[in-house]
């Protein structure tokens, strides 16, 4: 039996200097667009390591710490896990804590999706990207992007 997911995750908003935001479409829910997300693999996995791992697994982008730098917003959201996904968690778990990160990338960066996880990707101005997200916490993070960039 597959182990239960840990109800702690990361959200990584990928953007360009001019606030174009990358969204990816879920393979298990076509039409559901989001930023990179993913749960900790182990309870002691550091959050920045989770963010870097998920960024690479879902987009092929490597956060090298020099050209591509993950920014920890030191913010988190607690939200209800959608009922359709609760079977992935231990019985009785209904909430997840999501930690927010962002990463600025060049506009021409190559994107390599994980086909089992995502179908398509699109770059959109941040306000349009926020409107397209199915998750309200993801949309809110994108709306806060202008206040959480190095510019």
Predicted regions and their residues:
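Unchanged
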Residues: 40-137
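A small-molecule sensor/coupling module
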Residues: 141-148
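A short gly/proline-enriched turn/hairpin at secondary-structure junctions
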Residues: 34-37
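Active-site beta-strand termini and strand-to-loop segments that position acidic
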Residues: 14-17, 26, 103-105
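A conserved beta-turn-beta hairpin within the catalytic core of GNAT-like acetyltransferases
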Residues: 29-32
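Catalytic cores of nucleic-acid ligases and guanylyltransferases
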Residues: 151
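Conserved N-terminal beta-strand and adjoining loop/helix that marks the start
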Residues: 1-21, 43
């Amino acid at each position: 039996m597959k182990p239960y997911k840990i109800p702690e995750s990361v959200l990584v908003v990928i953007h360009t200097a001019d606030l174009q935001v990358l969204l990816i479409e879920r393979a298990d829910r076509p039409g559901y667009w989001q930023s990179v997300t993913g749960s900790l693999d182990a309870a002691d996995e550091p959050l920045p390591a989770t963010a870097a791992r998920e960024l690479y697994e879902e987009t092929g982008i490597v956060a090298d710490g020099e050209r591509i730098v993950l920014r920890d917003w030191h913010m988190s959201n607690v939200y209800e896990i959608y009922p359709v996904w609760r079977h992935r968690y231990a019985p009785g778990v209904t909430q997840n804590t999501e930690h927010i990160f962002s990463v600025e990338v060049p506009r021409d960066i190559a994107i390599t999706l994980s086909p089992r996880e995502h179908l398509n990707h699109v770059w959109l101005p941040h306000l349009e990207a926020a409107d397209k997200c199915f998750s309200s916490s993801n949309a809110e993070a994108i709306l806060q992007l202008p206040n959480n960039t190095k510019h």
